[in-house]
Swiss-Prot record:
<keyword id="KW-0460">Magnesium</keyword>
<protein>
    <recommendedName>
        <fullName>6-carboxyhexanoate--CoA ligase</fullName>
        <ecNumber>6.2.1.14</ecNumber>
    </recommendedName>
</protein>
<dbReference type="GO" id="GO:0009102">
    <property type="term" value="P:biotin biosynthetic process"/>
</dbReference>
<keyword id="KW-0436">Ligase</keyword>
<keyword id="KW-0547">Nucleotide-binding</keyword>
<comment type="pathway">
    <text>Metabolic intermediate metabolism; pimeloyl-CoA biosynthesis; pimeloyl-CoA from pimelate: step 1/1.</text>
</comment>
<dbReference type="GO" id="GO:0000287">
    <property type="term" value="F:magnesium ion binding"/>
</dbReference>
<dbReference type="GO" id="GO:0042410">
    <property type="term" value="F:6-carboxyhexanoate-CoA ligase activity"/>
</dbReference>
<keyword id="KW-0067">ATP-binding</keyword>
<keyword id="KW-0093">Biotin biosynthesis</keyword>
<comment type="function">
    <text>Catalyzes the transformation of pimelate into pimeloyl-CoA with concomitant hydrolysis of ATP to AMP.</text>
</comment>
<dbReference type="GO" id="GO:0005524">
    <property type="term" value="F:ATP binding"/>
</dbReference>
<dbReference type="Pfam" id="PF03744">
    <property type="entry name" value="BioW"/>
</dbReference>
<dbReference type="InterPro" id="IPR005499">
    <property type="entry name" value="BioW"/>
</dbReference>
<comment type="similarity">
    <text>Belongs to the BioW family.</text>
</comment>
<comment type="subunit">
    <text>Homodimer.</text>
</comment>
Amino acid sequence: MTYSEKALIFCISVNLKFILVHINFQSKRKEGNICGKKPTYSVRMRASRNAPHEQGGKHISGGERLITYSGLQEAVDGLLHKGFSHSRGIPDFMQIQLESINEPIETIRPLPVAFHQSDTPEKGQAIARKLLQKAGIPPHMIEKAYENIAEYAEARGAVLFDIRAGERIDGRGNRGVRVSRMDWPSHDFQKWAFTHNMPENSRIKEAHAIAAKVCAHPGIIAELCWSDDPDYITGYVAAKKLGYQRIAKMKNAGDESGCRIFFTDGSIDTESCIHFLEKQPVFIQREENI
């Protein structure tokens, strides 16, 4: 059954430093809805200090949800709380953007999960290198990527690294590639966490959702990631062959540098890959629910 839906796109920017609230509202009409289901909305938050990200501000926090109308208030409240409770500091700029999803939402299975103990960053990084090799990345290409990690850490998003050319190929500079428009419904995540004896915390949920979407792209071999959160030292390697491999310690506490590299096989259309990562809506859901 189809019906005429009024799709709303609006953006709320709050610059706390100057106590300024700016609201930009647009509306458009779209015929029908996906499979007769309730409209779904992408809710995205970014927070920074001293200026917006594109003006050189320090990144503080980010997050997003895919949610129906009835869950919008809870989603926005949760993102506000996340933005103001990050260990990187208190933001003076925050933007929350909502937009309707008017295209099919792809469903992706969670990755198999494993955990590796490491009591020093050096041991953790050594584990990461071995896992990347198991995923199919040549050792000399792993080392070439590591040589540029300090530069890649400046990017707000991820870096696409071509393992044939041995170089970064996204062309996004400090912006990087932001994996977006994905979520893992809470009830499904909770059941998955219980089954796999994993903590039911939002950090694992969000990281695994990103990893699952990244690994779903046929041209991406593996992801290497650790957070820029100074209080969070765990990182991971994710790959189709290996699943989601968490590593206990990949940096020292207090270190605000992070890393996110997507290793590609050299055959991808870069713009198509970036479009999938940033624009394709995705739900993570266990196999029995697909």
